[in-house]
Amino acid sequence: MSGRPDTPAVALADRSSDAIPVPEPLSEMLPHKGLARGTVTRLSGVNSVLIAVIATVTQNGGQVGIVGLPRLGLLSAAQMGADLSRIATVPSPGTDPVEVAAVLLDGMDLVVLGTRGVDVAPSRSRVVMGRARKQSSALLVVGGTWPGAQTTIDTEVLTYRHLPAGDDLREARSGFGRIGGMRLRITVSGRSQRAETSEADLLVPGPGPVRPVTLVRAGQARPQLAVAN
């Protein structure tokens, strides 16, 4: 962090939209095409979507703080192309993870908070949201509730997929081989928009040259990527 609490540590590549970049399948559904600065978003469901968000933010020059999520895999983030030097983690924040997250809002573009079952009072949530607005940062609450959250993102797995038959797996058949990804259903709702649902594919590369795990709009996957039986 910069040591200047009133200024984000690192400016993103494009601050003109006042939104923090997210993967394309999400950006198409969000009002600001990203996570609006100064807001709180609640995310539930598939961890891979959270990891994809973290990867996208750091790829675009942003700083991310992660609080209260000791099992969140940074290896998975690296496989999605995250810049690990731009991630600060507090896996065990003690009895008050909300306070730790509030402090990190001073120096991070995005703070990811696992509430660990803590109920946040509306009065306190307003204070934290005010801090996010002042610092032009964003808070992403994972697996819990947050009174007054502007946006809610719910995700679920629809199908798993095996690695595609091709140059790397010439003998692959439907229902065999390592999992090569999954199809997800993503629902975005908020105080300023009706619920909108879309589908996305998480693609895991097979043997061969190292390629990142990617989250793309449904239908951009290679046609060989068949649903496993």
Short names for language-model regions:
Residues 1-42, 46-66, 226-229:
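Detector for small/aliphatic-rich hydrophobic stretches
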Residues 162, 193-229:
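C-terminal regions of RecA-like/P-loop NTPase motor modules
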Residues 63-121, 125-130:
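Long, charge-dense
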Residues 39, 109, 182-184:
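Structural beta-strand/beta-sheet cores of well-ordered domains, especially the beta-sheet scaffolds
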Residues 41, 65, 88-90, 140, ...:
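Hydrophobic/aromatic beta-strand patches that form the interior of the parallel beta-sheet core
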